[in-house]
Swiss-Prot record:
Family recorded in the similarity comment: Belongs to the MSDIN fungal toxin family.
Record-listed cross-link Cyclopeptide (Ala-Pro), residues: A2-P8
Protein name: Phallacidin proprotein 1
NCBIfam families, sorted: amanitin (TIGR04309)
UniProt KW Kinase keyword: no
GO molecular function list: toxin activity
Disulfide bond sites: none
Post-translational modification as stated in the protein's UniProt record: Processed by the macrocyclase-peptidase enzyme POPB to yield a toxic cyclic heptapeptide. POPB first removes 10 residues from the N-terminus. Conformational trapping of the remaining peptide forces the enzyme to release this intermediate rather than proceed to macrocyclization. The enzyme rebinds the remaining peptide in a different conformation and catalyzes macrocyclization of the N-terminal 7 residues.
Domain of life, per lineage: Eukaryota
Length: 23
């Protein structure tokens, strides 16, 4: 999500979780 890019420190962590969930 774009709102995650706002906070890389947390976005990277959440992005990883979302990526695992989507795949």
């Amino acid at each position: 999500p774009a709102w995650l890019v706002d906070c890389p420190c947390v976005g990277d962590d959440i992005n990883r979780l979302l990526t695992r969930g989507e795949k």
